Amino acid sequence: MDEITFRRKINFCFYFRHVYICVLIALFLQSSAYSQTSDKNRDKKRKVEILYADLLTNENPGSDQKKLLGNVSLKHNDILMYCDSAYLYQKSNLVKAFGKVHIEQGDTLDLYGNYLFYDGTEEKALITGKVELIDKETHLFTSSVDYDVANKIASYTDSGRITNAKNTLTSIIGIYYADQKMFHFKDSVKIVNPDYIMTGDTMDYNTETETAFFTGPSEIKGDSIYIYCEKGWYDTKNDVSRMWKNAVINNKQQIIKGDSVFYEAKTGFGQAFRNISIADTSNDVLVKGDFAWYYKKPEKFMVTDRAMFIQISKDDSLFLHADTISAVTVGDTAGKSFRLMRAFYGCRIFSNDLQSKCDSLSYSFQDSVIRLYYAPVIWSEENQLTSDSVAIFTKNRQADRMELYNSAFITSLVDSVRFNQIKGRSLKGYFRNNKLYKINIEGNGEAIYFLEDKDELIGVNHAKSSSIEIYVDKGKITDIYEYQNPDGKLDPPLSNLPETLKLPGFNWFDIIRPKKVSDIFRK
């Protein structure tokens, strides 16, 4: 035999030995698994044992039926069964028990009833009569329960009532998973708590955490709050909830909606996420955005991410956008409370008759005054008004008058290059039917305005006066009156270049004017 042939035979022997060892290991593992499965099956098929009975009879000789009377005790795997009397069918491993039936499983679960049918092979039990299941502090009352002993699952289909220290829960259908301490309820689900009533079509309830999980349309009603959602959870122990899908919170002052809502009932604190709205029906106010938080006491809220405030009016609603909108309820010196709304950063206002832009503003529901700060601009029909700060006084949700403080300036367009301009230290504007009709300028008044006759320019007036009064009709200046040391001149309309006909401080901001509601979100 040559060396190559010898090596091939040696390698084959080693290969065969390796395969042989692998086969032995596989057979061992299979045998072990089969042995474990067989052990489990033997445990499962273990016969029901008789622990005690006052009297044991065999009514039918040759039959496997045994009759047990008085203080009956039976055992099967990890459960104990007690009753007044029972029939035990040993071959089929069945039990029929009567009177004061009690199943005990482990240290915590007890099941009581008037009648029991138990299949030891399948480890399934049916308990009827006045059924009570007790698992620690949770009590289930119903007329009939199917109990899967091996998996510790109890179910009922003919109305049940569950109680613990604080809550009483009822439903038509229920399933209890004892290992997970979880109930699944369906059909006419209701939780009654001293502070609220919770209802729904489908609900899960964890008995350890005392948390209810909603998987269908659900409502929570209390003395001062109403909650609706179609998905979410409510921690009944700590009064904390999280809701999704058409979530609504109504606390009698506001109605809060959002794609997702979090609420702590004890503190009155809530958060809402995406597509949120807060409606104040008493003041006809609606606030929208993509994030909000809310406190009930003291009452306050904040909205950001595409925040929008809407003052609802039948004739002309007002729309406000800002980076952040907040409101707080405060008290005055007379002890009365009122709401103060604030908006910060990039404020824009749109209504049909009035538009505005500023950095920040406030709105007092006490005196119905809107105050604009930091480079405010107001547009009313054809007129643009600017100053250091502005106060707009409203009545019946319409502008009544406005006051411009420091460097007041009013501008209107005559043609593409010419502007009527009036400026002064302060300005008061008056509205009729939400339209500007009169303006009073006080202190250091100056004016450049063009005279027209049948839409034809006939002159340009330069005027100075301590006091100027202007009348407006349909957005156009119709009359100007100068009081207290007036001084001025009238020039032909084309005697000056347009760029020279501008007062110090002139600006034209028409490019940033909101012309429709969506423009308030324009950067």
Residue locations for each model-derived region?
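Bacterial Sec-dependent N-terminal signal peptides
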Residues: M1-N41
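N-terminal amphipathic/hydrophobic interface segments
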Residues: Y34-K523
